[in-house]
Swiss-Prot record:
It comes from the Eukaryota. Transmembrane segments: none annotated. This is Cell division protein sepF homolog. The keyword Repressor does not apply. PANTHER family: CELL DIVISION PROTEIN SEPF.
Length: 108
């Protein structure tokens, strides 16, 4: 399976004319999870932000994926935040994340 960034890849240019890329991932089947996890890690490694949607993943597996992504993001010097229930945003070290009042929704 080859990954096609064309449908899930965005350029963001709003603040200070700085651009960064965002990869949006939403695995629908359990068989896709390992593939999407590797794609998200590769994207972070090359300084792309990742939005990962856990909506169709059962809690125990979603928690393991979240732990893996959070650990890898931390190791690469990046940051993460929960946008809403089951939707997380991971950014590389080149992007500074600012969340209002540090209010983070619970995972589930």
């Amino acid at each position: 399976m080859t990954f096609d960034y064309t449908n899930s890849f965005y350029n963001y240019d709003q603040y200070n004319n700085k651009k960064f890329d965002i990869v949006v991932l939403k695995p629908l089947k359990e068989e896709e999870i390992e593939y999407y996890l590797m794609q998200s890690l590769d994207a972070l490694r090359i300084n792309k932000a990742v939005v990962f949607n856990f909506e169709h993943i059962d809690y125990p597996l979603a928690q393991r994926i979240l732990d893996s992504l959070a650990g890898a993001t931390y190791a690469l010097g990046g940051d993460k935040t929960c946008i809403r229930e089951k939707l997380y945003f991971f950014v590389p070290k080149t992007v500074k994340l600012q969340a209002p009042n540090n209010e983070t929704p619970s995972f589930f």
